[in-house]
Amino acid sequence: MLDAFAKVVAQADARGEFLSNTQIDALSKMVKEGNQRLDIVNKVTSNASAIVTNSARALFAEQPQLIQPGGNAYTSRNMAACLRDMEIVLRYVSYAMLAGDSSVLDDRCLNGLRETYQALGTPGSSVAVAIQKMKDASVALANDTTGTPIGDCSSLVAELAGYFDRAAVSVV
């Protein structure tokens, strides 16, 4: 896993070049956004349990066949596995948001996930809906500035949404 800083340095080093002004400007912007990034990650992680639980409830309300006999989330064991997987995706999205880079999400969570779900007979489209619901909840939290002098963080909220979109696309 590389954060945005390590990635830029590694790329420049591989080319045997100094960092360009554009690269330095991008890293400076990331430093300036650091507190906002931390605030967003804190909001998501502090509410992770509610995000996962409420997203799962909404998914099962829309797709009740998942929790009926024969459904992929039927039995407490399968339900627990579903909630665990949702929590893992949310956790790695928060890591990517903190790092400002999707490589940790891709490498440690998403690579091979579609194949795993296919092998288990889990409908990827349902997983994508669950991820979308977690995205909606997380974006709402990130946009809620009540009690937090977070300022304009629309680009960071878009970045957060992008990590969820990346995860949703990877499972279908």
Swiss-Prot record:
Any one annotated GO CC term: phycobilisome
Principal cellular location given in the protein's record: plastid
Tree of life domain: Eukaryota
Modification after translation (UniProt): Contains two covalently linked bilin chromophores.
CDD domains per UniProt: PC_PEC_beta
Topology of this chain in the membrane: Peripheral membrane protein
Keywords in alphabetical order: Antenna complex, Bile pigment, Chloroplast, Chromophore, Electron transport, Membrane, Methylation, Photosynthesis, Phycobilisome, Plastid, Thylakoid, Transport
InterPro entries in the cross-refs: Globin-like_sf (IPR009050), Phycobilisome_asu/bsu (IPR012128), Phycobilisome_asu/bsu_sf (IPR038719), Phycocyanin_b (IPR006247)
Pfam assignment, any one: Phycobilisome
Residues bound to (2R,3E)-phycoerythrobilin: C153
Binding site for (2R,3E)-phycocyanobilin: C82
Residues bearing PTM N4-methylasparagine: N72
Gene3D superfamilies, sorted: Phycocyanins (1.10.490.20)
Gene Ontology biological-process entries: photosynthesis
Subcellular location: Plastid, Chloroplast thylakoid membrane
Family of this protein: Belongs to the phycobiliprotein family.
Known partners and oligomeric status: Heterodimer of an alpha and a beta chain. Dimers further assemble into trimers and the trimers into hexamers. The basic functional unit of phycobiliproteins is a ring-shaped hexamer formed from two back-to-back trimers contacting via the alpha chain subunits. The trimers are composed of alpha/beta subunit heterodimers arranged around a three-fold axis of symmetry. The phycoerythrins also contain a gamma subunit which is located in the center of the hexamer.
Function: Light-harvesting photosynthetic bile pigment-protein from the phycobiliprotein complex (phycobilisome, PBS). Phycocyanin is the major phycobiliprotein in the PBS rod.
Stated name of the protein: R-phycocyanin-1 beta chain
Organism, scientific name: Porphyridium purpureum (Red alga)
Organism lineage: Eukaryota, Rhodophyta, Bangiophyceae, Porphyridiales, Porphyridiaceae
Name of the encoding gene: rpcB
